[in-house]
Amino acid sequence: MIKAVCFDLDGTLVDSERLYLAGNVHAAQQMGYLLTCEDFLPLVGISDAQFQSQLNLLIDPGQQAEFAQLTQDFVDARIDRPESLAQPGADALLRALKLQQIKLALVTTSTAEYTHHMLQNTHWSDVFDVVITREQGRTKPAPDLYLQAMSQLNLPKAQILAVEDSPVGVRSAKAADLTCVQVQDLAPRSHLADELIDNLFELEKMIHA
C-alpha cells in the first residue's frame, strides 16, 4: 500500500521545461543564433554533465553566461503566472493525496530558491511534507536526493512511489530502489520505469488500484 509519493518538479508537476525552451530560443535569437526549440530539446531531462556537453554544441562557451541570464530573465518575467505553470491535473492530484493522508515529497535538482519560488507561485507551499533540492546531495541520476527524501519520510521503500518525467529522474529513483512511474512528456521514454502514464490524471487511479 502506497503511503508516500515523491514527485519530481520540472516537467512532472509544472510545465517549466516548455517555458525554459522558449527562453532558450529567445536568448539565442537575441544573441544572433538561428536556433529553434528542436535544437534545445535534447537539453531537457538530462544530467548536469550531459546538459553542459549539449549546450557547448549550441552556444559558444564564452557566451553562455549571457545566454543563461537572458534565458532566466525571460522565464522570470513569466513565472509568476501560476495558471500557466501547473501540469494538467497536478493541483487536484496533490490536494486529493493530501486529504487521503498520503505523505508527499518533492525531489528536484532545481535550487532551493527556485523551488520555493515555484511552490509559492503554484500555492503548494503547504502541500509537501518533505522538500529536497539540489543542495542536499549529488544530483540525478545519482540516488542521493531520493535517499534523503526516504530518510525524512521514514517509511519502508515498498510504501513509497516516485513520479518522474525523464529517464535521468527514473534512473535516480531506481538507484534508490524505489518503484517509479514515468509521466511521458518532452523527455524520452525510460525502459527502467515500472509504469508509464500519459498524464497525472491516471496516477491517482494507479495508486489506489
Predicted regions and their residues:
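Conserved phosphate-coupling serine/threonine residues in phosphotransfer and NTP-handling enzymes
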Residues: 12, 108-110
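Asp-based, Mg2+/Mn2+-dependent phosphohydrolase catalytic module
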Residues: 1-3, 95-98, 111-209
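Short, acidic loop-to-helix structural element flanking the phosphoryl-transfer center
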Residues: 77-106, 116, 143
